[in-house]
Regions:
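Active-site region of glycoside hydrolase catalytic domains
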Residues: 1-195
Length: 195
């Protein structure tokens, strides 16, 4: 997510490219590299535990209106399930793929999805906050930052219930290997004491 989406699609991280097609191609090739690495690790270190760590946030609609509910579901598929579904179910989410113009979709070769979706010994999840989304005329989904909630110094909502919701939703959607919470918490202004 960080290198593909933030680096190639949004241009926030290195290499600073803001291009939907480049981001989706980078994501596909990262997932393909993961699958190829699993093969090598399983052959050369058969007793090791091998898996993948994903950044994920549950998505919620801003309101109960059908368009906002649909926007939140598309945001989940487009931002998070795009990385989870290939490794856990062997395909990209249909709604997310349909949201990408055909000429910007990643080139998926015969056999790619089988490589990507090899069984893993575990999956790691990095969770920090939830995403709240609504629909707008020009955009399928737009993220809303809640103004009434407690926010971290990074502007992320403090929302512990989101971790439970994320785990429950993933369990309903996929047959999961063992799950590890590999990152979570909040970023706040720390004071250095005696240091």
């Amino acid at each position: 997510f960080c290198s593909a989406f933030l680096g190639y699609e949004k241009g926030i991280h290195a290499p600073g490219i803001a291009d939907l097609g480049a981001g989706r191609r980078a994501a596909h090739h990262l997932l393909l590299a993961h699958g190829l690495a699993l093969r090598v690790l399983n052959i050369n270190s058969p007793d090791s535990l091998n898996g993948l760590v994903l950044n994920m946030s549950p998505t919620y609609p801003k309101s109960d209106c059908a368009r906002d509910i649909e926007a939140a579901q598309l945001a989940d598929d487009f931002l998070f399930q795009w990385y989870a579904q290939p490794v856990l179910a062997g395909s990209y989410p249909d709604k997310a793929m349909a949201h990408i113009p055909e000429h910007l979709r990643p080139p998926i070769e015969t056999g790619d999805m089988a490589i990507i979706s090899q069984p893993m010994d575990y999956i790691g999840l990095n969770y920090y906050t939830r995403g709240i989304f609504h629909a707008e005329a020009d955009n399928a989904f737009v993220e809303t930052v809640p103004t009434e909630a407690e926010l971290t110094d990074m502007g992320w909502e403090v929302f512990p219930q989101g971790l439970t919701d994320l785990l429950v939703n993933l369990h309903k959607r996929y047959s999961l290997p063992p799950v590890f919470i590999t990152e979570n918490g909040v970023a706040m202004a720390d004071k250095v004491v005696n240091g």
